[in-house]
From Swiss-Prot:
<dbReference type="GO" id="GO:0006098">
    <property type="term" value="P:pentose-phosphate shunt"/>
</dbReference>
<dbReference type="InterPro" id="IPR037171">
    <property type="entry name" value="NagB/RpiA_transferase-like"/>
</dbReference>
<dbReference type="InterPro" id="IPR005900">
    <property type="entry name" value="6-phosphogluconolactonase_DevB"/>
</dbReference>
<keyword id="KW-0963">Cytoplasm</keyword>
<keyword id="KW-0378">Hydrolase</keyword>
<dbReference type="GO" id="GO:0005975">
    <property type="term" value="P:carbohydrate metabolic process"/>
</dbReference>
<comment type="similarity">
    <text>Belongs to the glucosamine/galactosamine-6-phosphate isomerase family. 6-phosphogluconolactonase subfamily.</text>
</comment>
<protein>
    <recommendedName>
        <fullName>Probable 6-phosphogluconolactonase 1</fullName>
        <ecNumber>3.1.1.31</ecNumber>
    </recommendedName>
</protein>
<dbReference type="InterPro" id="IPR006148">
    <property type="entry name" value="Glc/Gal-6P_isomerase"/>
</dbReference>
<dbReference type="GO" id="GO:0005829">
    <property type="term" value="C:cytosol"/>
</dbReference>
<dbReference type="GO" id="GO:0017057">
    <property type="term" value="F:6-phosphogluconolactonase activity"/>
</dbReference>
<comment type="pathway">
    <text>Carbohydrate degradation; pentose phosphate pathway; D-ribulose 5-phosphate from D-glucose 6-phosphate (oxidative stage): step 2/3.</text>
</comment>
<comment type="function">
    <text>Catalyzes the hydrolysis of 6-phosphogluconolactone to 6-phosphogluconate.</text>
</comment>
<dbReference type="InterPro" id="IPR039104">
    <property type="entry name" value="PGLS"/>
</dbReference>
<dbReference type="Pfam" id="PF01182">
    <property type="entry name" value="Glucosamine_iso"/>
</dbReference>
Length: 268
């Protein structure tokens, strides 16, 4: 049974006993938001990330989800992407396609991925243009209080350094406000060339999920969620800057990742 509570500023926190429990809860949540979004406006615009997140979504291709999810209404995007060929092992697109999208009935034309034949800067520009066209056609909702799209659900992993998408600590990309998509040629993790959603886009979503597992994430989770004295290095921690302006934020983690949280230590 997950230990769950709501922080006044940092959203809902769900600390799970193990990865199996986390995966079941995450997939239940995705299916629930999918159904609600389709009921509300006829589509579900979901944003994926790379890493272990896709493996935690694996139960979506199993009963009952494979039959009850309305895959034809899904529109799929990526919060960040490595600027490599789509068949390259580093590609977030390939990871999602091989392990999820090729096994369900999402229409190929509903999958919005980057152009992998151009530079990182061009890929970011083209990706933003494609999303702007989808906002203009009302496939993707527009935010009521910012010049940003309002995705139904953005799924983020988190690194041990507190990075989300390809927004790394102390990187200039954190300061980009006017673009929806920006690019990096000096990523702190290889490969160096990437595109990423900017913080205004992430924080304009209706629902944002951050998934973190393992002891190596515990300190970053503590800095991202707990109340800390100021000034503090956590202020430049990308995960702490995830703060939907008019949406929901939920943290899914296992006990190891949550082990340094003040509330979790007290409950133990």
């Amino acid at each position: 049974m997950a230990l769950t509570w709501t922080h006044k500023d940092r959203g809902e926190i769900r600390v799970h006993e193990n990865l199996e429990e986390l995966s079941i809860d995450l997939v239940d949540y995705i299916a629930e938001i999918s159904e609600a979004s389709i009921k509300e406006h006829g589509a579900f615009c979901i944003v994926l990330s790379g890493g272990s997140l896709i493996s935690f979504m694996g139960k979506l291709i199993e009963p009952p989800y494979d039959k009850i999810v309305d895959w034809a209404k899904w529109y799929v995007f990526w919060a960040d992407e490595r600027v490599v060929a789509k068949n390259h092992d580093d590609s977030n697109y390939k990871l999602a396609k091989d392990n999820l999208l090729s096994k369900v009935n999402v229409f190929p034309r509903h999958i919005c991925s980057i152009n992998d034949t151009v530079s990182a800067e061009e890929a970011a520009t083209e990706y933003e243009f494609a999303i702007r066209q989808m906002v203009r056609s009302r496939t993707v909702a527009a935010s009521d209080n910012s010049d940003s799209p309002r995705f139904d659900l953005i799924l983020l992993g988190m690194g041990s350094d507190g990075h989300v998408a390809s927004l790394f600590p102390n990187h200039p990309a954190l300061e980009v406000k006017d673009d929806w998509v920006t690019f990096l040629t000096d990523s702190h993790k290889p490969p160096p060339e990437r595109i990423t959603f900017t913080l205004p886009v992430i924080n304009s979503a209706a629902n944002v999920v951050v998934v973190a597992t393992g002891e190596s994430k515990a300190n970053a989770i503590h800095l991202a969620i707990d109340d800390l004295p100021l000034p503090d290095s956590s202020l430049s921690l990308p995960a702490r800057l995830v703060h939907p302006s008019n949406g929901n934020l939920i943290w899914f983690m296992d006990k190891q990742a949550g082990s340094k949280l003040d509330r979790f230590k007290f409950s133990e």
